Structure formats: C-alpha cells, structure tokens
C-alpha cells in the first residue's frame, strides 16, 4: 500500500503560509499580519492571518486550516458515496489579496489536501488548488508573466498539464449570470491522485510556491502607478464581481459555510469595500472598455 504522508503535507502548508506572509510584509513595509488561532468544535482548527490598511495592500488574508472528523458531511458523501463511514481530514492554505492601487490586480491562491480513512482499507485522498489573477486595468505583459510562471512550474509534470489546468481555471472562475470570467485565470485542479502521492504532492508544492513568483513582480511593477477617483471607483465596482462569485459559485466558500466552518476565516476573501452600479457600461475606447473587450473571456497567453 502506498505511503500517504499527511504530516509532510501539513508541514509544507504551515511553511507556505509563513513564506507568503513574509513576502507580502516585505513588499508592503508599513503593515504586518495579525494572527488569529482558532479551534473547530467538531475537530481541528487553524490560523488566520490578515494584513489590513497597508501602503500596498488594502487587505490580504492568508488562512491555514486543518479540520477533521469521524464522519463525512452529507454534502460530501452525496457525490462520493465511497466516503460514507470514513473519518476525514482536510487541510489547506487559502489566500486573497486586495491591493490599494487599481493598477495592481487582485489575486487568489489555494492548495489543499483531503484524506478519508477506514481501518483495514486503503485511504481515499486527493490534492487540489491553483491560483488566479483578477486585473482591473490589465497589462498584457503582466498577464503573460503570470501565465508563463504557471507554464514553467507545470512543465516537469507533463507537456499538457498547463493547458489542462488553465482551461479548468477558465471554466471554474466564470460568472454565468455575467457571461464573463472573474479575471485572466491561471491554474485550477481538483481530485488529483492518479499520479500517486509523491508526484501529486510535488505538483501541489510547485503551485503553492509559484504564487509569489507570479504575483510579486506585477505588484512591484504597478504599485507606484498614479491613479485617481475614476480608477478607484472602477476597482470597487469590479470587486463586486469577486463578491458575486464567492457567495454564489465558489465551492470552498459554500462548503465551508454549510459544514460549520469558521465564518470569519471563510469570508476573509471578501474585499473590505465594493460597490454596485445599475446597468454600468464602460465608455467606448476607454481603459475600462479594454478590460471587457479583451480580458474577460478565455484566451491564450
């Protein structure tokens, strides 16, 4: 039977949270993460870290959680009846960054591991995760850098992995009621176990470690770009799409709220400010129109 080292996964996730928080603090320079350790009554807990009102980041949340129980939630066993009667553990790091400057994109990343065990039987396990970018005033070179980072980290795992997980990301982060993508995508994968534990874990580590490589150069390039009220208003309007996606479609948010997760940590992904405007239309030829015309449908980078 293949050895599944869940302790190594947890150690990696805790280290990843530390590394990402340190990188973001070093970039912001004026604000630090506040840590909130919490326990889940049914088993497990986590540590949530939030940086607020920094010079670069309006809000950044980086959450680690490790929850477990003797019985799977009904919402999970409905889709996977083979999990009934098994104890489970779910652990992961999830983060969302909302910058001050509208020229810096919002970003999101997540890596997670799930295992369900029963004495005398092989464990059922899988990895999932990815990262995606949501620009308001997009630059082609930023989007290409983001996707080139993804291509590079995928290459050792197979020639078609980037394309598969890029397409999956485009499909997942899509708002049907708006007929637009949430942003310019990146990578998304779930239920990954067919490679065996070692390779699946190595890929998940590559995705987690690749996030900062993809994101910080964009932040550094755009953080001093001058902007005014018009850009700020548009940023807040587009943040509304983030709220719509997370509350209506995001599986992690819905699962967390339905399974008695910690609400403050689950909703940490929400922007501190957002706005809606009735029947908004960008002006023809404007930078805002460029986003709608060229960046909110899947494309090759």
UniProtKB/Swiss-Prot annotation:
SUPFAM superfamilies: Coproporphyrinogen III oxidase. Substrate binds at residues 94, 110-112, 260-262. InterPro entries: Coprogen_oxidase_aer, Coprogen_oxidase_aer_sf, Coprogen_oxidase_CS. Signal peptide: none annotated. Residues 242-277 are annotated as: Important for dimerization. Gene3D superfamilies: Coproporphyrinogen III oxidase, aerobic. Its cofactor is a divalent metal cation. Its EC number is 1.3.3.3. It catalyses: coproporphyrinogen III + O2 + 2 H(+) = protoporphyrinogen IX + 2 CO2 + 2 H2O. The record marks 177 as: Important for dimerization. GO terms for biological process: protoporphyrinogen IX biosynthetic process. Pathway: Porphyrin-containing compound metabolism; protoporphyrin-IX biosynthesis; protoporphyrinogen-IX from coproporphyrinogen-III (O2 route): step 1/1. It is an enzyme of class 1 (oxidoreductase). It holds the Pfam family Coprogen_oxidas. A divalent metal cation binds at residues 98, 108, 147, 177. Its main location: cytoplasm. PROSITE patterns: COPROGEN_OXIDASE. GO terms for cellular component: cytoplasm. It is found in: Cytoplasm. Involved in the heme biosynthesis. Catalyzes the aerobic oxidative decarboxylation of propionate groups of rings A and B of coproporphyrinogen-III to yield the vinyl groups in protoporphyrinogen-IX. Belongs to the aerobic coproporphyrinogen-III oxidase family. This is Oxygen-dependent coproporphyrinogen-III oxidase.
């Amino acid at each position: 039977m293949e050895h599944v080292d869940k302790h190594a996964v947890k150690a990696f996730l805790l280290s990843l949270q530390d590394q990402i928080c340190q990188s973001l603090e070093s970039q912001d320079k004026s604000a630090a993460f506040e840590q909130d350790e919490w326990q889940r009554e049914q088993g497990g807990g986590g540590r949530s870290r939030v940086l607020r009102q920094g010079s670069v980041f309006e809000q950044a949340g980086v959450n680690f959680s490790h929850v477990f129980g003797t019985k799977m939630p009904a919402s999970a066993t409905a889709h996977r009846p083979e999990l009934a009667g098994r104890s489970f553990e779910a652990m992961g790091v999830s983060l969302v960054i909302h910058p001050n400057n509208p020229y810096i994109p919002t970003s999101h990343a997540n890596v997670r591991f799930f295992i369900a065990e029963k004495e005398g039987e092989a464990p059922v396990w899988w990895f999932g995760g990815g990262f995606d970018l949501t620009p308001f005033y997009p630059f082609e070179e930023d989007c290409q850098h983001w996707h080139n980072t993804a291509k590079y980290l995928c290459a050792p795992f197979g020639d078609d992995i980037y394309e598969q997980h890029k397409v999956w990301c485009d499909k997942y982060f899509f708002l049907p009621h708006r007929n637009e993508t949430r942003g310019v995508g990146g990578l998304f994968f779930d239920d990954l176990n067919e490679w065996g534990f070692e390779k699946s874990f190595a890929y998940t580590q590559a995705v987690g470690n690749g996030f900062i490589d993809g994101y910080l150069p964009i932040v550094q390039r755009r953080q001093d770009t001058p902007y005014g009220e018009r850009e700020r208003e548009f940023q807040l309007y587009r943040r509304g799409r983030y709220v719509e996606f997370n509350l209506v479609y995001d599986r992690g948010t819905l699962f967390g709220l339905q399974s008695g997760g910690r609400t403050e940590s689950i909703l940490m992904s929400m922007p501190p400010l957002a706005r809606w405007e009735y029947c908004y239309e960008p002006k023809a030829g404007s930078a805002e129109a460029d986003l709608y015309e060229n960046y909110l449908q899947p494309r090759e980078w």
